[in-house]
Structures are given as structure tokens and as C-alpha cells.
């Protein structure tokens, strides 16, 4: 990637001096005249007047780096955008140049690390949160319409952080550069997040950044365009990012020219041609959103799915950004309405608002995440938990870890408050340096219902996250942590599952399936002439595994196998039916045989009748259990309603108390002002009394003189 911001791969034509990091600058006033687009034009360009505005128009000369306009168009589907025709012509300067470059397709290949689009958006939120140390108080994620085509949507991520000066701006747009690698409490360390996230969300991005200027430097503002469409359709053989910079001199924004004015104009023309903005004034107007400092990222040509619809859904919820496709499960959305305490587990995969609310373990008090005009409320999974237990995990120190690295993780686990509904919710939210890396990590994949309802939260700063921040590097430390989490979840579930309606778990035993042979003399009766007795025949009896876990779980009611003791009389009849304890009989003719068979039929009928009675009893007990569960659910809902009403009442009381305090403060202030006024009036009254007394004395004196 060319840090100079050039759109053409050529060497500088001017020897750089020591000014501004060794780059030669030429300042020109953009406001010298009535037209903000009044630029000096180089020889290879001309101008035309349209709507009283002067536009830069290239002459009919095809540059070396651009092939004829029949080049293939970039696919609007992300997973197909990296495909290229090997037979397509290669620009002449690419094939004849021995230089090794970063090919534009690397931008797309690098972005494929983000399988999940919301994970890419989270990277941009991380960058804004890191700017809290530079004064950032908010990040606003919004969407608007592309002015160039008037119909497509564009994504905007804006914060009021410290912004970037031209040097830092180019570092941000360079691959693999990061100042955060060794900073405390910073997840970012690879210098790759901005490029991968923007290219995963859309084919193109344009960045506006304004910096106050420190250490005596003037404020600056920069514009840079990272456009895969531009690089692909112009057949560039290296990743080029056109940029233009401005500096505030005498309260006027003037351009900063590196190397040559022609190069600056090339960059501006490229940005205007391939961006959503139609003029230079449109570009400069974007800085009006930033006030004194900040960064505004505009992502356009957003990716589409296989059906031609945008991957990001801006229509379903006007205050949210959601995903279409496999990440969206309508069943989970409906369940989230029924089970509010499980809402984040059920919706974070497709809803940015839900995901952003749990993205950070703690959010700075003065920092806001605004999504399409509405604040995202911070949510802690601890608020969704009950019967919480706290564990401490301290792994064995490895030689490669720094001595100051914190090697203790505090784990909190418990049941989700909706666990008594027996819905399949479980997993651990694992954070790294305050950032959620593994949301609802399912470590125990037990058969049946074991582990359901158990969720937890911990911060593990000693494990290295992957560069896409959607998982951890597979290391021995991670494997040990996973094993320990499984152990904690099993122990917690086994000891407390009965508290949410599951059958108590006993100590597990290893029962192996076995096949044995037992003689059954009665079941193989041979009524054959010449045979005086029946010969025992081996019969296979299958003994299945016995597992102390529930089976056939459904969201509302748990069904379990129960054993009921049948009275000894029925057991004896049962044994009689299967020939256990019945001696072999001799052949006494068909009459005796029919009598025996009739007797067996009668005993079987009694046994069937008893079993039917037991079945009816079990069905009655099941209905009673369902009724009790429904009553408990109703009571739970009433409890939640009462809790909500109590919360609202407390909020109203707090509001009234605040208003009372405000009225009391106003009353005290008015009283103080009244006292001051009264003191002033008393003082004036005393002064007036003194004046009256003096006048009276003068009158008396005057009268005395007249009498004399």
C-alpha cells in the first residue's frame, strides 16, 4: 500500500525536505474566490463550467495504468468478489516491472477472516472506544442513501475522538501497522482491523479525519479512499489509497501538497470519481459532522447475499442493523419475546444492538454507543443469571508470559433466569481486556439435557485472541481453560439441576451394554409326538446403558422415565407368564394343554388390566405435573410483571425525589435572593430615615431662626 497516497505508482519528482516528516509541502488557499473547487489545473487536464461551478475534466488521453472500459465488473457478493479471470489482460507497467507489491486482491483475501459481518463492525467500535483516552465521548453507527445512485445504502461509523494527522492517517491505512501492540487494555495489536472490517462490510470505504493539532502544529484534516472497486475495475496491480490533506492556516483550510500539485489533483479526481460524493464541496461538507476533531468512516457498495439482497438489513428495525441469511433464526427471535432474560443469547448473532450491548465487560461512564440515533444500553450477563457461584482460575505460569501479566481469572456461573423453562441455553462469555471474544462459548456438548441453562462470564487476559477477535489462538493454555470450564459446568449442573425442575443427578456409573443368554423352557414348548419334555433354548436379552441424564427434553415440559414397583402378586404372575418357576409338564393330552393355555390367558388379561390401571395413574400424575408447571410459569410471569412495576415505581419515586430536590434548591435560592433584597431595602429605609431626620432638624433650625 502506498503510504504517499498516490494513485499512480511513480517515484516522487521533488526531493523531500525536512518539513512535516521529510515531505515537501505546498500550501494553497481553497477559499481564494467564490468557488471552493477553484483549483490550479495541470496541463493534462482542462475545465468546464457547469451550474456556475468549475469541474476538473481529463483530456482524451488514456493513462498507462488504465485498460479499456470493457474490464469485468466487481461482483457485489463478498465471497465471489475475490474471483478473477486469469486470462484478463495485465497492465503493461505491471508485467514489465520487477517490483514486488501488495496486490489489491489481498484486501479481499485479508477480509475473509471475518466470517461474521457483525464481528467486522465490532472492530470499528473497538477503534472508537480506544479514542476515549483522546477525548471521545461517543461512536455513532448510522446509514444513509448514496447520493451518486440515489438508492443504495451506505454505512457510517463516526466518533469524536482525537482524529488523525496526515502521518497517523497513512499509518492507519497501511497494512499491519499498529501503535497499540504493547498498550495496556487495548485489544488491537495487529494493525489489521480497519482494513479487514471495512472490506468485509463493503467493497469501498472513504475516511474523513480531523485533528486539533498538538505541540504547536496547525489543525489538519485528511480524506482517504480504500476502494476495492477502483483497484479491481482499473486493473491496478498494487493496493493504492488516494488521499488528500488540508491544514488550517489563518482560519482557512488550505491543501497540503506532497511531491507535486498534479499528484494531489490526481488523488482528488480519483476520489470524486469512485466515491459517493459528486464534488469537492460535498467531501468538505462531511467534516461539518466532526466539529473540532474526530473520524468519520463511510462504507459503500455494501455486499449482497446470493439472492441479490444486502447482507446488512436496515429495514426490519429503524434503530438497529441486522443480518439476513443463516445468522437470522426466526424461531429464536420469537423465543426472545417469550424469554426476555435469554434475549441476548437468542439475538446477538443477527442484531448489532444486541451484540454491542454485551460487547464490552465495562463501558466508560462518559462513552455512548449510538446506533441509528438511539443509544445502545450496556448489558451485563450477570443481570440474566440466578444462583450465581464464583470460582477462581489460576493457570500455571508459562515461561513466555511476562512477569506482570495477570494470571488470575474470576469466573461467575449460574442458571439463566429462564432456565426453568428448560430451553437449550448455555455457554460462557469470555472477555479479553474488556472485549468479548467468545460469546456464549459452548464447552460441554452433552447428550440430552445435561448442562442446559448454565451460563457464565469471565475475563481471561492471559490468552491470545485471534486477529479477527472472534476466537482465541488454539494453545495449551486455552485447552486447559476449556477443560476447567467443562468441569465447573458439570459440577454445578449435577449439584443444582434439581433446583430448576430436572431430576437429581446421581454419581455416574459406567454401565456397558451386554448381551447374555438365559434358558427359557416354557417359551419353546414342543408338542411333538415322541417328545416327553421341552428342551431349554437360549434366548438373547439386551441390557442397555443406564445414564443418569434426562432425555427427550422439550422447551416447556421435561419427560423422564420413572420406575414404579408392582405388587408381589403381579410380579409372581409375570414370572409365571414367562415360565420362570414353572416346571416342564408332561404331555397329558390336548385337554390338559388347553386348560393350561386358558389359565395363562386369564392371568395375562389380569396383568394387562393392572398395567392399564398403572398407565392411567401415570397419565393422571403427568397431567397434574403439567398443571403445576403451568401454575409455576403463571406465577413466574406475575412475578416478573410485579418486579417490572416495582422497578417503574422506584424510578418514578426517584424522579419525584429528584424533582423535589430541584424545587427545594430553587426555593432556597429564591429565599437567599429575597433575604438579600430585604437587606438592601432595610438599608435604604434606614438611609431614608436618616435623611428625613436631618431634614427635620434643618426645618426646626430654620423655624428657630425665623422666630428670632
Curated annotation (Swiss-Prot):
Note down the stretches annotated as region Disordered: 1-47
Where in or outside the cell is it found?
Answer: Nucleus
* Compositionally biased intervals (Polar residues): 1-11
Which pairs of positions does the record mark as disulfide bonds? none
**Is DNA damage given among the entry's keywords?**
yes
InterPro entries listed in its UniProt record: HATPase_C_sf (IPR036890), MORC_ATPase (IPR045261), Morc_S5 (IPR041006)
Q: Indicate yes or no for the key word Transmembrane helix.
A: no
EC main group: hydrolase
Per the record, the coiled-coil ranges are 590-665
Pfam families hit by this protein: HATPase_c_3, Morc6_S5
Biased composition regions of type Basic and acidic residues, renumbered to the chain:
23-34
EC id: 3.6.-.-
Its quaternary organisation is: Homodimer and heterodimer. Component of an RNA-directed DNA methylation (RdDM) complex.
* Family from the record: Belongs to the MORC ATPase protein family.
Please report the name of this protein according to its UniProt entry: Protein MICRORCHIDIA 5
Amino acid at each position: 500500500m502506498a503510504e504517499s497516497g498516490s494513485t499512480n505508482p511513480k517515484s516522487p519528482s521533488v526531493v523531500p525536505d525536512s518539513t512535516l516528516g521529510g515531505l515537501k509541502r505546498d500550501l494553497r488557499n481553497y477559499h481564494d474566490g467564490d468557488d471552493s473547487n477553484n483549483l490550479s489545473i495541470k496541463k493534462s487536464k482542462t475545465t468546464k463550467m457547469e451550474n456556475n461551478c468549475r469541474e476538473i475534466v481529463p483530456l482524451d488521453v488514456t493513462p498507462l495504468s488504465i485498460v479499456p472500459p470493457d474490464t469485468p465488473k466487481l461482483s457485489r457478493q463478498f465471497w465471489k468478489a475475490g474471483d478473477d479471470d486469469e486470462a484478463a489482460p495485465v497492465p503493461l507497467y505491471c508485467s514489465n516491472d520487477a517490483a514486488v507489491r501488495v496486490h489489491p486482491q489481498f484486501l479481499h483475501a485479508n477480509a475473509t477472516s471475518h466470517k461474521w459481518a457483525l464481528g467486522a463492525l465490532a472492530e470499528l467500535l473497538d477503534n472508537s472506544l480506544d479514542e476515549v483516552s483522546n477525548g471521545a465521548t461517543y461512536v455513532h453507527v448510522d446509514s444513509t442513501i448514496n447520493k451518486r445512485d440515489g438508492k443504495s445504502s451506505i454505512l457510517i461509523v463516526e466518533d469524536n475522538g482525537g482524529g488523525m494527522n496526515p502521518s497517523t492517517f497513512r499509518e492507519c491505512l497501511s497494512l499491519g501497522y499498529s501503535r497499540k501492540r504493547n498498550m495496556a487494555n487495548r485489544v488491537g495489536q495487529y494493525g489489521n482491523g480497519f482494513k479487514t472490517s471495512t472490506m468485509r462490510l463493503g467493497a469501498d470505504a472513504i475516511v474523513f479525519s480531523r485533528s486539533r493539532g498538538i505541540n504547536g502544529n496547525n489543525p489538519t484534516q485528511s480524506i482517504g479512499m480504500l476502494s476495492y472497486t477502483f483497484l479491481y475495475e482499473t486493473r491496478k496491480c498494487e493496493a493504492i489509497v488516494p488521499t488528500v490533506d488540508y491544514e488550517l492556516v489563518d482560519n482557512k483550510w488550505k491543501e497540503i501538497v506532497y511531491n507535486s500539485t498534479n499528484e494531489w489533483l490526481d488523488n482528488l479526481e480519483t476520489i470524486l470519481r469512485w466515491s459517493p460524493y459528486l464534488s469537492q464541496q460535498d467531501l468538505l461538507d462531511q467534516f461539518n459532522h466532526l466539529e473540532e476533531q474526530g473520524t468519520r468512516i463511510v462504507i459503500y457498495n455494501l455486499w449482497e447475499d446470493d439472492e441479490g439482497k444486502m447482507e446488512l438489513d436496515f429495514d426490519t428495525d429503524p434503530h438497529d442493523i441486522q443480518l439476513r441469511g443463516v445468522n437470522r433464526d426466526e424461531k429464536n427471535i420469537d423465543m426472545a419475546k417469550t424469554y426476555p432474560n435469554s434475549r441476548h443469547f437468542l439475538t446477538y448473532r443477527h442484531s448489532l444492538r444486541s451484540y454491542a450491548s454485551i460487547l464490552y465487560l465495562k463501558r466508560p461512564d462518559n462513552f455512548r454507543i449510538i446506533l441509528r440515533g438511539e443509544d445502545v444500553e450496556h448489558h451485563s450477563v450477570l443481570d440474566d443469571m440466578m444462583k450465581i457461584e464464583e470460582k477462581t482460575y489460576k493457570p500455571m505460569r508459562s515461561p513466555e508470559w511476562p512477569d506482570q501479566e495477570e494470571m488470575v481469572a474470576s469466573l461467575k456461573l449460574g442458571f439463566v433466569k429462564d432456565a426453568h423453562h428448560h430451553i437449550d441455553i448455555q455457554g460462557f462469555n469470555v472477555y479479553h481486556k474488556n472485549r468479548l471474544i467468545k460469546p456464549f462459548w459452548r464447552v460441554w456438548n452433552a447428550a440430552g439435557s445435561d448442562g442446559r441453562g448454565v451460563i457464565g462470564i469471565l475475563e481471561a487476559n492471559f490468552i491470545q485472541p485471534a486477529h479477527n477477535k472472534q476466537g482465541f489462538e488454539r494453545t495449551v493454555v486455552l485447552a486447559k481453560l476449556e477443560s476447567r470450564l467443562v468441569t465447573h459446568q458439570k459440577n454445578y449442573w449435577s449439584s443444582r439441576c434439581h433446583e430448576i425442575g430436572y431430576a437429581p443427578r446421581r454419581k455416574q456409573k459406567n454401565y456397558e451394554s451386554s448381551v447374555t443368554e438365559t434358558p427359557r423352557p416354557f417359551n419353546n414348548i414342543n408338542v411333538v409326538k415322541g417328545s416327553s419334555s421341552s428342551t431349554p433354548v437360549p434366548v438373547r436379552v439386551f441390557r442397555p446403558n443406564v445414564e443418569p441424564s434426562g432425555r427427550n427434553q422439550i422447551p416447556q415440559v421435561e419427560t423422564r422415565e420413572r420406575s414404579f414397583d408392582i405388587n408381589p402378586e403381579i410380579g409372581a404372575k409375570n414370572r409365571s407368564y414367562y415360565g420362570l418357576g414353572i416346571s416342564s409338564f408332561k404331555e397329558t393330552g390336548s385337554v390338559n394343554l388347553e386348560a393350561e393355555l386358558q389359565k395363562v390367558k386369564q392371568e395375562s388379561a389380569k396383568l394387562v388390566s393392572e398395567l392399564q390401571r398403572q398407565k392411567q395413574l401415570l397419565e393422571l400424575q403427568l397431567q397434574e405435573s403439567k398443571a403445576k408447571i403451568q401454575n409455576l410459569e403463571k406465577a413466574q410471569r406475575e412475578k416478573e410483571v410485579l418486579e417490572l412495576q416495582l422497578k417503574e415505581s422506584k424510578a418514578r419515586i426517584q424522579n419525584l425525589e429528584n424533582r423535589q430536590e430541584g424545587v427545594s434548591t430553587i426555593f432556597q435560592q429564591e429565599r437567599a435572593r429575597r433575604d438579600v433584597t430585604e437587606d438592601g431595602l432595610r438599608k435604604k429605609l434606614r438611609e431614608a430615615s436618616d435623611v428625613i431626620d436631618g431634614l427635620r432638624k434643618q426645618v426646626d433650625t430654620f423655624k428657630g431662626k425665623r422666630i428670632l
